[in-house]
Amino acid sequence: MADYSYETTVDVRLRDIDFMGHVNNATYATYLEQAREAYFRDVLDVSLTETNTVLVSLELEYASPIEADDAVTVALRVPELGDSSLPMEYEIRANGERAAMARTVQVLADPDSDGSQPLPSEWRRRIERRK
């Protein structure tokens, strides 16, 4: 498994399951969002809902299905930082085995314009320390 600096567990809910008994493909993006929320809380010490981050990119590659009774974890890392962008790479695991790989890019939006704003220096420090 690749080296990821953060990991969190997610619960498979009944509503996540499709007619084939697998976690629905769209739910994987929800698991990524839950991992981002946990990362912001645990690493950056801020609630994701209190930031002006906007998801601008999502890439998701499925490797194997997740079943209703699987233990699911999401590992993530920040490969590099942009001026205002925060890319994240993920591995969703079911019972320790890769179920999907993903990448997202969040941008810190400037609420006073249609543009972006630089990532806070405190975020940069915490992210670099976590690597």
Give names to the regions the model predicted.
Residues 3-4, 62, 67-68, 79-131:
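HotDog/MaoC-like acyl-thioester-processing domains
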